[in-house]
Amino acid sequence: MIDQEAQDYFYRHIWQSNIHLFKYSGDNLVDEINALKPKLVIDAGCALNFFKGKIKNLVGYDPVFEEADFICGHFDAPFKPECADVILALGSINWGDHDDIAHMLIKVKSWLKPGGRLYMRGAPGGYKSDRG
C-alpha cells in the first residue's frame, strides 16, 4: 500500500522543486508540447497538475490529488478512444506487476490519436508493489 502522507510530501516538496532537472519535465516539456499545437493533452496521473495552465488544452487526472481535473484512475478516466494528441504518463504507469503495467499502457494508448505522442517516464528497473 502506498503511504499517502509520504507521497503527498514527495510531490509537494521534493518533486516540485526539482522538476526542472528532467529533460521531459518542466519548461522543456511545456515548450515542446505547445509547439505541437495539440487539441487535447491528457496528463495521466497528474499528481498536483503541475502542467495545468502551462500546456495548452491539458486535462489531468489522478486517483488521489484534488488538484487534478478528474479524481480517477486509468481505467475510470472519461476519455474516448483516439481523442488525444499527446499523453503524459510521467511516473504514473510503473505501479504494480508487469501485467498491471501492460494493461495500463494498453488503456492509455487507446486514447492516443494515430500519429500522437506519448511521453512516459517510469522507475528504472521496475517497481515492486506490495502485490509482487
What does each model-identified segment do?
Residues 1-78, 99, 103, 117-132:
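Class I (Rossmann-like) S-adenosyl-L-methionine-dependent methyltransferase catalytic domain
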Residues 85-99:
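A short SAM/SAH-binding and catalytic strip from SAM-dependent methyltransferases
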Residues 41, 59, 87, 108-111:
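Hydrophobic aliphatic residue packing
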Residues 102-114:
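A short glycine-rich, Lys/Arg-flanked "PGG" loop and its adjoining helix->strand segment in the class I
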Residues 76-87:
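A short acidic, Gly/Pro-enriched loop at the edge of an enzyme's catalytic core
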